[in-house]
Amino acid sequence: MKYIGAHVSAAGGLANAAIRAAEIDATAFALFTKNQRQWRAAPLTAQIIDDFKAACEKYHYSPAQILPHDSYLINLGHPVSEALEKSRDAFIDEMQRCEQLGLSLLNFHPGSHLQQIPEEECLARIAESINIALEKTQGVTAVIENTAGQGSNLGFRFEHLAAIIDGVDDKSRVGVCIDTCHAFAAGYDLRTTDECEKTFADFERVVGFTYLRGMHLNDAKSAFGSRVDRHHSLGEGNIGHDAFRWIMQDDRFDGIPLILETINPDIWAEEIAWLKAQQTAKVVA
């Protein structure tokens, strides 16, 4: 079964994220459990936790259908020790918040070397950061998102994701989220069903579908291989509709949150309905 949704706002209370997801007929959703552009957040109260769990139960969202995202400020591969510790502490807090909310996944961008340390050292720091967070939490899987490779961000090659996973001690609590826009911008073609087959055969060979715990379904304003992260609405960008139809008809993408981060929230309900309909539509080769 496909879990299809969007990254919805939690403004006014975390429970509102589940309500907003239900309003667009989503069967999955993503959210921030705190302000994504601030380091510190007030601890979750029992009331906030209870309200969130009640809303999820009311609208039939299990932890497998929810993909929380951490703060954009966190850099788990930071080259400077003091800044690395700050990021690690913030990441542990994010994991603990998920734990409190009964959530089983936490999606995050791997990190950046900032042109100060080699890629390999940065990837090792990211893996070590994950190990530290996993030791201090229970039941939450660290879900590494592929990146477009803007600036000094790592994670734009499947090999980067594999290297991080290789350095994580508890393989049962690490996974990946593939963002279609990021993959395309990083040089993984998705414009035809044949290219989709090739790209995900590469993913299976290097990382493995066993680690796929979520997807971000975004078309791309950015050009193929541009290393620029610019999302677009489905079918309106440089990827086109075929990739998303193909994903909807491939059972390797069942049972994980498939999340829209497309640029127009006003049409998320339409995009979700379209994605659902593609499960039985004819694929044009």
Swiss-Prot record:
Catalytic activity: Endonucleolytic cleavage to 5'-phosphooligonucleotide end-products
EC numbers for this chain: 3.1.21.2
UniProt-listed InterPro entries: AP_endonuc_2, AP_endonuc_F2_Zn_BS, Xyl_isomerase-like_sf, Xyl_isomerase-like_TIM-brl
Domain of life: Bacteria
Cysteine disulfide partners in this protein: none
Protein's UniProt keywords contain DNA damage: yes
Signal peptide stretch: none
Binding-site residues for Zn(2+) 1, renumbered to this chain: 69, 109, 145
Chain positions recorded as Zn(2+) 3 binding sites: 182, 229, 231
Cofactors required: Zn(2+)
NCBIfam families found in the cross-reference section: nfo, PRK01060.1-4
Annotated family: Belongs to the AP endonuclease 2 family.
Protein name (record): Probable endonuclease 4
Organism listed in the record: Citrobacter koseri (strain ATCC BAA-895 / CDC 4225-83 / SGSC4696)
